[in-house]
């Protein structure tokens, strides 16, 4: 638990993932997004500041950390759920962001988890994700 708190503290002011920035630059009309494994909220905050309504999901409660970066108008576009991937419930969305989070799903549950992701994304919409790699 101490390591995860340190991670959130170290990443709370990090710039959004470059893929999310690139997505925003495509000038797609802001709609509903899910930030799956949102951590300290860098992508959530960026999406909201660019007009998106975001449901952020993480196994740790980082709601207050993220909320502190949003003004009163932006906070209305923010929702937060504490959920493990094995118990996840995903609502329909136009964009699902899952940067560095998918590998944390139990391999025994992965197929069901992936189907939930696939079923949640509305037709002709976008999944933005990044996995780990070795340099």
Give the location of each predicted region.
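Class I (Rossmann-like) S-adenosyl-L-methionine-dependent methyltransferase catalytic domain
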Residues: 1-30, 34, 39-89, 112, ...
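A conserved beta-strand element that flanks and buttresses the S-adenosyl-L-methionine
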Residues: 97
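Short catalytic micro-motifs in class I SAM-dependent methyltransferases
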Residues: 100-101
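A short glycine-rich, Lys/Arg-flanked "PGG" loop and its adjoining helix->strand segment in the class I
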Residues: 111-123
């Amino acid at each position: 638990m101490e390591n995860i708190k340190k991670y959130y503290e170290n990443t709370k002011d990090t710039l959004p993932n470059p893929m999310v920035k690139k997505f925003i630059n495509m000038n797609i009309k802001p709609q509903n997004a899910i930030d799956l494994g949102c951590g300290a909220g860098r992508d959530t905050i960026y999406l909201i500041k660019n007009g998106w309504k975001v449901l952020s999901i993480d196994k740790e409660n980082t709601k207050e950390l993220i909320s502190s970066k949003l003004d009163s108008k932006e906070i209305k576009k923010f929702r937060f759920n504490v959920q493990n991937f094995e118990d996840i419930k995903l609502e329909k969305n136009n964009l699902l962001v899952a940067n560095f989070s998918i590998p944390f799903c139990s391999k025994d549950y992965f197929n069901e988890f992936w189907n939930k992701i696939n079923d949640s994304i509305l037709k002709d919409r976008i999944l933005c994700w990044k996995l780990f790699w070795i340099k």
